Amino acid sequence: MKPTVWHHLRLCPHGHPDETLDDAAIAVDETGTIVWLGAFSALPHGYAHWQREDLHGAWVTPGLVDCHTHLVYGGTRADEFAQRLAGVSYEEIARQGGGIVSTVRATRAADETTLFVQAAARLQPLLAEGVSAIEIKSGYGLDLASERKMLRVARQLGERFPVSVYTTFLGAHALPPEYAGRADEYIDEVCERMLPTLADEGLVDAVDVFCERIGFSLAQTERVFEAATRRGLPVKLHAEQLSNAGGTALAARYRALSADHLEFLDEAGIEAMKAAGTVAVLLPGAYYFIRETQLPPIELLRKHGVPIALATDHNPGTSPLESLLLTLNMGCTLFRMTVPEVLQGVTRHAAAALGRADRHGALEIGRQADFAVWSVGSLAELAYWIGRPLCEQVVRGGATVFRRMNG
């Protein structure tokens, strides 16, 4: 790759629209590393003969980060969507053997190639919106072989597409049918066999649990957290989505990277998150899709200064969403978040929710040049437009990996 100066751009280096620089430039060396950024008029003479790319006044932000997805799975749950429209609740569907378990059956039946092809089709719309880092959870296998299959596919996506993929083992997502009535025994399997094996195979970056009355108890969640901690793995938690089960306080005790959903989070849980440095990941796509009415406590999160991230929560049952930009709009319209909050929610704070704030979410000297180029007049348009293609170009490590074709 030739050293390149990207110039005549409007720079938003940290994802905050109040911290910008007009007519800026970014110098990227042959390794894809940012070696200088600032006002184009102040470009040092040493870069005068580098290759130039004129962005004609376009906005540049850090590559976006989708910090909570379930992108790898088999089948769809369109039939359950119809059930919910007829008045059947998400919890009722789950108790009838639908919900997560129906996707488990489809995922177990699919081979790696099928799962890869299906997941790749879901990933590509996100890449075309400037996503350069993404978390992908397991949790639709619920046995060792199937969880391994999911995590292997996630790793393959990161190898074959220009995106950093971070894997999360979510073996404690639901109780598999063969363990009906034996939840503690299943947690034994998760902690003593599945997690150690998959971690030893290098397939796990973090560990998550679905802590809820239709998921796993606080005691069971803590067992998984203990097992993860013994392996030196960070933890995350699906928490307080359907009720206040106290999961967030537990997550904070283990200094979780994030607690996610949080519609029923209380102030005590928020205070614990703040003290632990745990990021609040809000998922408006799921809130919208299952027609929830309990809003997450945005004002209390603001009051206590808890960093807020946003993510698609792409999954087949409650958020079949393939647009992080639409997620921004939902964060504003449904949760009344501000434009600066949602933009930081998919850059700096989303990177922190993955424990990767040193690698993603900001443009700084010494970092890899991962950025998105936007054809908008103001950054507010990223959250304003619905369905309009706004990303003109995506750069990874200084190389253009996506360019929108006009006409």
UniProtKB/Swiss-Prot annotation:
Zn(2+) binds at H68, H70, H238, D313. CDD domains: Imidazolone-5PH. 4-imidazolone-5-propanoate binds at R77, Y140, H173, Q241, T318. Its main location: cytoplasm. N-formimidoyl-L-glutamate binds at Y140, N315, G317. GO terms for molecular function: imidazolonepropionase activity; iron ion binding; zinc ion binding. It is found in: Cytoplasm. The keyword Iron applies. Binds 1 zinc or iron ion per subunit. It holds the Pfam family Amidohydro_1. Pathway: Amino-acid degradation; L-histidine degradation into L-glutamate; N-formimidoyl-L-glutamate from L-histidine: step 3/3. SUPFAM superfamilies: Composite domain of metallo-dependent hydrolases, Metallo-dependent hydrolases. One of its GO terms (biological process) is L-histidine catabolic process to glutamate and formamide. InterPro entries: Amidohydro-rel, HutI, Metal-dep_hydrolase_composite, Metal_Hydrolase. GO terms for cellular component: cytoplasm. Its cofactor is Zn(2+); Fe(3+). NCBIfam families: hutI. Belongs to the metallo-dependent hydrolases superfamily. HutI family. This is Imidazolonepropionase. It comes from Burkholderia ambifaria (strain ATCC BAA-244 / DSM 16087 / CCUG 44356 / LMG 19182 / AMMD).
